[in-house]
Amino acid sequence: MTNLPIRFQEVLQLTNLGIGSNSIGFSTLTMESEKYICIRETTPDDKNNVVIIDTDNPSQILRKQMKTDAAIMNPKEPILALKIGQVLQLISIEQKMQLKSCQMQEPLEFWKWISPNTLALVTATSVFHWTKEGNSDPVKVFDRHPDLQNTEIINYRSDSTQNWLVLVAIHQRDGRVVGRIQLYSVEKQISQSIEGHAACFANYIVPGATRPSTLFAISSRTQNASKILVLEVSKGDGPNFQKRASDVFYPPEIGASDFPVAMQVSEKYEVIYMVTKLGYIHLFDLGTANLIYRNRISNENIFVTAFEESTNGIIAVNRKGQVLSVSIDDKNIIPYICNTLNNLELAISMACKNNLPGAEGLLTTQFERYFQQGQYKEAAKVAADSPGSILRNLQTIQKFQSIPPIPDQPSALLQYFGMLLEKGKLNKVESLELVRPVLAQGKKPILEKWLTEDKLECSEQLGDEVRPHDRKLALSIYYRANASDKVITLFAETGEFDKIIAYCKKFNYKPDFMFLLQRMANANPMGAADFAVKLVKEEGGPYIDANQVVELFSARNMIQETSNFLFAILDGDRPQDANLQTKLLEINLLHAPQNADAIMGGQKFTHYNRLRIGGLCEKAGLYQRALEHYTDLADIKRVLSHAGHMVNQEFLVSYFGSLNPEDRMECMRDFLRTNPRQNLQLVVAIAVSYSDQITPEAIIAMFESFRLYEGLYLYLTQVVVTSTSPEVHFKYIEAAAKINQFKEVERMCRDSNYYDPEKTRDFLKEAKLPDQLPLIIVCDRYEFISDLTNYLYKNNLSKYIEAYVQKINPVNTPLVVGALLDLDCQEDYLRNLIMSVRNMCPADSLVEQVEKRNRLKLLLPWLEARVAEGNIEPAIHNALAKIYIDSNKNPEAFLLHNQFYDSKVVGKYCEKRDPYLSFVAYKRGLCDYELIEVTNKNTLFKNQARYLVERQDPDLWAYVLSDQNEYKRSLIDQVVQTALPESTNATEVSATVKAFMDANLPNELIELLEKIVLEGKEFKTAKELQNLLILTAIRADKSRVTDYINRLDNFDGSKLAPIAIESQLYEEAFFMYKKFQFNVEAIDVLITHIGSIERAHDFAERCNQTEVYSKLGVAQLKAEMVKECIESFIKANDTEHYQEVVAAAERKDEYEDLVKFLQMCRKKIKEPAIESELIFAYAKVNKLAEMEDFINSPNSAHIQVVGDRCFENGLYEAAKVLYTNISNFSRLTSCLVKLGQYQAAVDAARKANSTKTWKEVSAACIDAKEFRLAQVCGINIIVHGDELEELIRQYEDRGYFNELISLLESGLASERAHVGMFTELAILYSKYKEEKLMEHLKLFYSRLNVPKVIKACQANQQWPQLTYLYIHYDEHDNAIQTMINHSIEAWDHVLFKETIPKVAKLDLYYSAISFYLEEQPLLINDLLSVLSPRIDHTRAVTLIRSLGHLPLVKPYLVSAQDQNVAALNEALNELYVEEEDYESLRSSIDANSNFGTIALAQKLEKHELLEFRRIAAYLYKKNNRWAQSVELSKKDKLYKDAIQSASDSKNPAIGEELLQYFVDQQNNSAFAACLYTCYDFLKPDAVIELAWRNNILNYSFPYLIQYVKEYTTKVDQLVDDFKARQKKTEEEKEQQNIESSQYQPDLTNLSYGYAATGGMLALPPAVGYQQQQQPQQMYNPNQMMGGFQQNYNQYGGF
């Protein structure tokens, strides 16, 4: 089931959850959605429970004990509806409370949730809707149709808008289940009864539409047909949906018991799921009603289903308790539709709409086909609809760009982009390609519109394209595309630095912390290091570059802090930290090598500068670390030469893995060159470890160059086990042989499958080993038997030859014998050798080898010995046969009686020696084709013919009788003359005849058959042979047919006559039929083939058979001989062709004769069609009295149909009689209208009560100006909304406006008055009686189609009425716009104020402000008070300012200032300045900070009033412009303000300048006050100098005394701190000396390459590196950070 188009699974098994099978049924189980299943169950102890199962959590079953008649769960929420008697309740399960209840007046028969908010209730007579919100009772929606009375309701559905409803019921009739559906329109309030079993609604977007239509799907199974029907009940904004229908297949074996029970629609896939009672699932395409898939999903009856939203499928429950889920399989549905259904159009449509895989090739092919055919619009549509980027890519765009433009037509590329924009959003590539030409043409508004509608995918590249044209637009694109760098760049270019900061905070952009860090490094180095670590490691960071921190610390010689910082931030091993890792290791190698070694040993860092660190390691004596870091071969050789013996061998083997193969080989050669014996084991170990990298060939060459075969053997011993290289295996064999490891040579030759056999063979020959077994093994394995035999024979090693054939491989004895024969070995030796092998030698090969050399007789003793032993091998007997044939030793007897030789082999051997013996051998072995060939070559045709007759092989006959056989004629002669006449076997004769037939030899077959049938005696009366003879003559020699018919009597004429007809032997066929009394067939030949109706008439007269007359009548009918054919049919009493006769009579207008014929037919059969035609014939011949008598008598005629025919043929009087007879008042009305009887027509129309009839009479009365009667008709028409527009058009086209208005006004009193009537009357008032329009709108507004009336008012420029409609239709934007544009007629201030807050388009606020400022300026503040909460104050103030009315709106500005908007604040401040209201200005500044403070200060500092200049100084101080603030205060002699500004600045320069000013002004009090206020930042030396120079020390003493007191306190604190630190340092040094004295290293007991303690290398320092002698310390990696200070002290610091 992996390739099915559906996913099918069992969701739950209710019986496994403890639900009894008696509780699983339609009356006890409900499922309104996939979420809940609700069950009423009765326990064994008669307790009633309601069980609620949440399918998402089926293990948590909610079981409530309650007695209820029915229960149903809300599809979405945990709300339970209960029915107890006629009381309904809604209960919230979560809140455990009753939400609402009601009492039904009638018993409830069915209920269902049609939405999460509405519960539908069905009683015996009506349908109600009950909403779960509020306290309302159920509301009646419609009455049940009479057709649904006494039926069982099984379903109730609604569309998404609840404008269409459908009620589904079933009942029993004639032993089958009949379905009945009531479709109800809420808008039209009408019902329709339809036959059907299941129905549903769906929203569907018709191609070419943007708004969906509502489709209604219905499935039914009647006694005659089973169908599914899809039709449109509510139209969208596109073309009409064409009704679709499809047959539904039900397996014949299930009978009439199955029928549809439910239908669900997946609007995503546009698929209808239909489920039948017996468990069949049908999937139909919604748009075409075509069947997609059908299968059985349940063997039990399914009784309830629901739509499964999670999978867009269907969920169902069967009687067994299985909860089943069926949905579309996204992966398989499209391949299934393509491959199984072969519906490529549906596959493409579904794939495009749902982005499903499987149709890529179809789409591409379709696109290419359209494109190549020049159908670019269709190609563009295919590309636009295609999913993903299959076609929506750059290549497609380039294809459309390459199309040359066509004059006066839009380009193909433009059409393509237009379709893409209609489809939705463009992708990145499409957006770029579309924007480029738009920008080139300067059409920025279009681009802005697309961005507003989200039609383009924003990207950085798109922003780059837009940026040269519009930076603001590019900024918007960058922002949407998250191109932060470009956003920051644009902000910087425009000087919007505040926005940069805000953007950085929002998107975690890094500010510059370097300045702060520099200041901290000078004051608190350790604190700076900690802070730097936090900046780098902080979440969301790093906020600062670590390299810059290192440079900063290093420049200040903060070594310890740098090391601590680096070790703290380097948590992971990242490539970007390479410089930092290098710096960390460099510091420690220079000052603490042990720590560096520990760090490198932890392998925490790998990205540092390895060359730099390697050199430092070598200088520090860490040779192993140096080797790990060096990559240059010269460096490596240097270290190995100086300290190779001090490095561990295991490390060296491992280390060699880091070298490239060339360097590795160079080092190994150095080892072997300097001391091969000492270094051999090391080199072998290295070679084995890195054999694959160096390649075995290179290593072998290296060992061979030093002639170290022992080393080569040791190396290959390790490698050969896993190697598949032929060279490796050969070299191993060679090395083993050279060091005399012969057993290993033998083992490898036997076990290895990889060495080169020829090369190994040649080596072993040349080596001349003491034992030839390895050579024998190689030659035997690789079939070098001839070489082996030559080598052994020429070297006199015969014992190895005998041992080989006798013990090692006797099977190869033939090859050995052949080789020895070629060497002219003695025959006695060969016979003895062969006999010693006996039957172990294969006979066929031995015979072949000997026979090739013409020495076959050599084997005769051996062959006869084998036969004597009972050997039955064909090769042995073949050889004996050949020997006997050559020696002529009674060969024919041997060939006839020996059963074991191969006939083909021996026959072939005899062909040139004795052809007859070859024939004997071939015949014995049934070698057909060989026998044919040898007899053809040797003209043995008689033997061949007898063999063929006896053989009876059709294939063989076909072979010899083919045209390619040049001996065919000779063979046929022998068969006809000798072989077949000799045969008395009927089977042989039959096989031979059949062979001639199959070979298509008709003349030869006739010759053969005449020989057998006409001349022979035994087969003369054979019926089959007579038939065959005549048949062959028909096909081969037509002239003989008549003679054969006369001479032969035992043939089958009924079978041969049709064949004769096929061969156009019509007279012969007629003669055959006539000879054997087949009269019907005979006349048929005369009519059909000979074409003589006259001969046929004479023949019929002679025969006088009814069947013959029937045939004749049919022929006459076809010949349009109407009178004659009617006569013939009457004689034949044949009514079968009455329809054709009627049609012919109508064509010839022979109704008089037709009446006779139909009267004859009516006597024989009572067919409604015959009686109907008889009535019409009466009407045509104007026999109305006979017609009326006939229709009043019992009859089964279709009087309605006949009446319609009479009406169509203008026989109105006859039609009137017929319609009156059947009371068809609708058609009767039409007749009366044609006859001009209008009053009678109105009376008949009233009885018909049909809209169509009323329309017909109305139109006739209007044309006849019978307005009273027309109004009677119109009253019955206008109540139908669909007909109203046409009726209005009829009146208006004829200019009867008053009559039309009178008609509609009279119709408003009707109970059936609808929206359309009120609407159309309003439109008529608008057109013709404007004075009545407003009154009509106010009285009947709620019953109007407002958009339609709005359109009429617009067309007729009725602005007050239009404004009224806009407001009541909630189109407040249009209402405001109308009042603004047409203020003289439509504006009303109160109405305007009430409406303006409700508008959606914000631009209207500002249009309203402009409107009021221009036309109603005194009411502007009243308007602004309403708009204030909603408008952009900045924009509003800018607008008012531009119009010059700022003072007019001061009340608005004051009331809105709490919003703290810059433009608003600045405008109000401007007004305060103009009004010289400094108090209000100061209050405004303090309360609101959002305005241009500097600009205002600059403006105020020149103001003539002091208080405004003081405010300017205050503003400078608030903006940290201390110097300007102080200077302004000094000018106005506001010394207190100046001193306070200087104090707030904390700037010593400003303070000193102010002191100097007071000294210059000799204002000593102000000088002292300034010292007191600015004490914390003034420098004492400057203060003392200034006071001393101006002789005012007394005024400075308070400052000096306070400063001395503070300074001495700080010095005392520093002295105490220094003493404490000194004491602590001494204690640490003492402890350090104690630890150093406890350990003395033993330098005499060192391991190979490593010190005995701690594993550190104990080597002298490198040349040129002066290392200070310090006691060696025990290293503890866990205390590394704590030990930094100690190591710094040991190495003397930095």
From Swiss-Prot:
Residues 448-464 are annotated as: Binding site for the uncoating ATPase, involved in lattice disassembly. One of its GO terms (molecular function) is clathrin light chain binding. Its main location: membrane. Residues 68-107 are annotated as: WD40-like repeat 2. Residues 108-149 are annotated as: WD40-like repeat 3. SUPFAM superfamilies: ARM repeat, Clathrin heavy-chain terminal domain. Residues 1610-1640 form a coiled coil. It is found in: Cytoplasmic vesicle membrane; Membrane, Coated pit. Residues 479-522 are annotated as: Flexible linker. Residues 301-329 are annotated as: WD40-like repeat 7. InterPro entries: ARM-type_fold, CHCR, Clathrin_H-chain/VPS_repeat, Clathrin_H-chain_linker_core, Clathrin_H-chain_N, Clathrin_H-chain_propeller_rpt, Clathrin_heavy_chain, TPR-like_helical_dom_sf. The keyword NADP does not apply. The keyword Hydrolase does not apply. One of its GO terms (cellular component) is clathrin coat. Keywords: Coated pit, Coiled coil, Cytoplasmic vesicle, Membrane, Repeat. Belongs to the clathrin heavy chain family. This is Clathrin heavy chain. It comes from Dictyostelium discoideum (Social amoeba).
